[in-house]
Amino acid sequence: MKHFVHILLLSALMVLSITSCDSVFDIHPYDTRVKGTTDLNAKNIKLIEQLCLDKDTMHIAVISDSHQWYKDLEAEIADINRRDSIDFVIHLGDLTDFGSTLEYSLARERLQRLRKPFVVMQGNHDCLGTGNEVYAKMFGNNDFSFIAGRVKFIMINTNAIEYDYSEPVPDFDFLEAEATRDSALFDRSVACMHAAPYSEQFNNNVLKPFNYYVMNFPNLMFCLYGHGHQIDEHDFFNNGIIYYEVAAAKKRKYRIFTITPNGYANEVISL
């Protein structure tokens, strides 16, 4: 009898977890039908490139790893919205914990509260389940680039483990092509990724060629990454190029980068 009662209780909990409005899952958590705005990165890149076309100084807010810490993400967004100087926002990935469509939608709804255009990278958690398909519909390709104020931002998929080495991650053909594509429109470069070199997600068998292709970009200034949930920075390849880590939303810390004609500065914002 006691065992039967336990079974009934577990069954009731399962029903509640499936039907609860607050759950990050619906009945089909990996249903890939995406309602609402799609292809967000391409749409926002057009805005970013237009807004920054003639700017020689830009202010970029960089956030990462919001997962299901929605209140913390909302706090970061509110703080960014109070700063009129921000030109655009970069999210370095891990919008979700499980790659579910509902998680993606909940994150998108909050990011669309930003008063400035934004782009979103794909994190390793965002690849889980049918996350790759949902990300592609909602945001676009997971390797992409854009040019703002004569600076090219290269957004590199480095989530190699999630692809079980079945695809080229990082994609050196993409990097090689981007180094010269639209070369007349940019003089400097910034590389962005979710997982940094030497992390467990990165394909550390290709560290040397990765550094080679990244360093091929004209006047590479710095690199950005998330994944580790901390504020940190490293000169991974001892070549003067600093890789800046951006903290998870739960830490209520993010970075603002100011790019000027003579260089750049960065500030850690603590809420």
Give the role of each language-model region.
Residues C21-L106:
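N-terminal active-site segment of His-dependent metallophosphoesterases
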Residues M1-L8:
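Bacterial N-terminal signal peptides that target proteins for export
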